[in-house]
Amino acid sequence: MSFKEITPQQAWEMMQQGAILVDIRDNMRFAYSHPKGAFHLTNQSFLQFEELADFDSPIIVSCYHGVSSRNVATFLVEQGYENVFSMIGGFDGWCRAELPIDTAY
């Protein structure tokens, strides 16, 4: 089993149906702005994530530009998560698509 790649628009539509979007960017960038409703997935927050997500929950991984999210998506599949997606373009693509964001400013 592997992950699938989806566009930011597809990710947003899936989130409206209950998918979990995890943002793996660094603390400072996540705090400044991130996709609306995103969970900040870090080594420190992984246990909290495990409590939040079922193994069959749709999980979308977002990073800066859509590259490192593939590695985390692969890791999640290896951990037993069955419905994993990597978001093409990452947060940069999300912003270009003019999708909702939460910001600190």
Curated annotation (Swiss-Prot):
Annotated Rhodanese domain residues:
15-103
* One Gene Ontology molecular-function label: thiosulfate-cyanide sulfurtransferase activity
Mind telling me what this protein is named? Answer: Thiosulfate sulfurtransferase GlpE
- Where it mainly occurs, coarsely classed, is cytoplasm
Q: What InterPro entries does its record include?
A: GlpE_sulfurtransferase (IPR050229), Rhodanese-like_dom (IPR001763), Rhodanese-like_dom_sf (IPR036873), Thiosulf_sulfurTrfase (IPR023695)
What biological process terms from GO does the record include? Answer: glycerol metabolic process
CDD domains named in the record: GlpE_ST (cd01444)
- What's the domain of life for this entry? Bacteria
Q: What class of enzyme is it?
A: transferase
Reaction(s) catalysed by this chain, per the record, are: thiosulfate + hydrogen cyanide = thiocyanate + sulfite + 2 H(+); thiosulfate + [thioredoxin]-dithiol = [thioredoxin]-disulfide + hydrogen sulfide + sulfite + 2 H(+)
Query: Quick check: keyword Cytoplasm in the entry?
Result: yes
Q: What is the role of this chain?
A: Transferase that catalyzes the transfer of sulfur from thiosulfate to thiophilic acceptors such as cyanide or dithiols. May function in a CysM-independent thiosulfate assimilation pathway by catalyzing the conversion of thiosulfate to sulfite, which can then be used for L-cysteine biosynthesis.
Q: What is the lineage of its organism?
A: Bacteria, Pseudomonadati, Pseudomonadota, Gammaproteobacteria, Pasteurellales
Give the active-site positions: 63
PROSITE patterns in the record: RHODANESE_3 (PS50206)
Keyword vocabulary terms for this entry: Cytoplasm, Transferase
Cysteine pairs bridged by disulfides in the record: none
Q: Where is the protein situated, by its record's location annotation?
A: Cytoplasm
Q: Does the keyword Cell inner membrane apply?
A: no
Gene Ontology CC terms: cytoplasm
Q: What is its EC number?
A: 2.8.1.1
Origin organism is Haemophilus influenzae (strain PittEE)
Return the similarity comment. Answer: Belongs to the GlpE family.
